[in-house]
Amino acid sequence: ADVITRSDHLHLTAWSFFTDPPRSAARRAASLAHQSGATVSFDPGSFQMIQEMGVATFLATCADLDFDIVLPNKEEGQVLTGSDDPHEIARGVAKIFPGALVVLKLDADGALVLADDDFTHIPPATNKLVDATGAGDSFAGSFLAHHLVHRSPVEAARFATRVAAWVIEHVGARPAPDARLSTLTSTVR
């Protein structure tokens, strides 16, 4: 609990919400974070797991947690909202999680940021796909690292698309860092 209450931000994924005891721990962590003034972000994590659990049940486990940032991919957004249109998905997610900054990961189409009722499309940073493993997680982590320092969701999404592009141009979810990645990440400090 001390680590959470001393933190500025807590990131949760839906993998924590599918069963107990992780579900109870994640809910408690989000509550502690908010009580201590930290922000909380959420990545729905798996459209298949949401479908298996049932959308209504899934939302009942997390909709009341007042997430500050929600980072679904398009498939997760489709399952949560029933829409195929990225703008409608983002608006639907914003209705599910009122007040949250919504960053919709669009795979080969980049990302869509919905902040303060304004949409900004961020184009993809590459079209050279080698392996998409880890792209969404690298996007989310990069977005949060940049946004929590610079407080610009659009610039954070641009940064995240560049880091995710670097990831998908390599094999595996954790490619070895190189000079290009060092240059990309040096802007976060």
Specify the residue positions occupied by each region the protein language model found:
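Short amphipathic alpha-helix with an adjacent loop that forms part of the alpha/beta core around
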Residues: 1-5
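A short small-residue
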Residues: 6-9, 141
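Conserved beta-alpha-beta core of the PfkB/ribokinase-like small-molecule kinase fold
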Residues: 9-92, 109-110
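Conserved phosphate-binding/catalytic region of the ribokinase-like
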Residues: 31-35, 82-189
